[in-house]
C-alpha cells in the first residue's frame, strides 16, 4: 500500500509541474462599446462586447429593448474578425432614449451565460421598463444533474465492485439489486431527457432539439454538455442489451461514468488535455470509491469474515480515495489559487469549503473503520451510512461547483464589471 501511495504522490507533483497558469471560468463580460450606462450624442452604429473567452458564432444571441420594454429587431450578431472573444451587432435607426441589450452566449465548457448593458442616445429616459427576458434559473438543472449523474456514478462504481467482489464469493450485481437495476436505468434515462430539455431551454440563441431533428451536428458539437447527454443516452441503451459478456458491461459502465467528466469546467481550462485527464481520473475514482461504500453496505453480512474481500476492498478504497483527493487538489491548482479562493465571495468558494469538510469527514470515518477492521473487529454500519451521506454531500457540492463560476483573475474582472452594471 505504501508503494501505491508513493506513486500517487509522485504523479501529483509531475502533473502539478505541467499545469499552466492561464485559466478561465464561464464566459464573462469584460468590456463593451458603448459602455454600460453611457450617454451618447449619436447612434453608435453597432454594439460590441468582449468576453473572457472565445465564443461560438452559432450560440450567440443579442436582444435590444427600448425604454418601453419593446424589442427592436437586430441582424444576426457576428464575431470580430481575428478575435473570437468579441461579438458585434449592427444597430438600426434609433430614437433618443435609453436602451437595454441582453446578450446570451455559451461558454467553452457548454454553460449558458447572460449579460446585460444599457446605454442612452441623446438623454436618459425618465422611466425604463425592465425587459421581459429573465436570467434562467439553474436550480432545476443542478437538481436533475445531481440525481441523474449520481445514479450513473453509483451504478458504474457498484458494477465494477460487484464484478470484482463476485470473485471473492460475494453476491453479483443482479443478485443484491434485483429490480433496482431496471429502476435505476429508467431513472437515469428519464433524467438525461429532462436535462436535455432544461439545458435547451436555457439557450436563447439556438434550439438544440431542432438542430438534433435536422441532423445539424455542427451546432450540436459546439456544446460539450449537449454531446455528453447524447452519448450518455446511447450508452445507456447499449447497457440494456441482455446476455452480453461481462466485459461488455464493464467497458460500457466505465465509458458512461468517464463521459460525465466532459460536460463541465474542463473545456474552459487551459491546457484542455490536462484538465480533461484530471477530471476523468477524478470522476472515475469518485465513482469507484462511492460504489465500494454502497457495495459494502449492501453486502454487509456477506463481507463479514471474508479476508480475501477485506484485502481487496481496503486496497481499492485506499487507491481510489487517494486519487480522488489528489486529482481534486491538482484541479484546484490548475483552475485557480488559494489566495483567489480565500478572497472570493463567490458561491463556488463556499461550495468548495463544504466539499472539503465533507471529504475530510469521510476520510476520518474511513480511517477509524479501517483500523478497527484490521484489528479483527466488525465494521459499524451506522458509521458507514454517515460516510455515504458525507459522500453524497461532496458529490452535490462538486456538481454545483461545475455549474458556477470559479475564482480566477478573469472571473474577478468580470465580477467587477457585473457589479458596475448593477450600480
Model-derived features: positions:
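Surface-exposed, proline-enriched loop/turn segments that connect beta strands in immunoglobulin-like
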Residues: 34-35, 74-76
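Bacterial N-terminal signal peptides that target proteins for export
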Residues: 1-8
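C-terminal segment of classical bacterial N-terminal signal peptides
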Residues: 14-22, 403
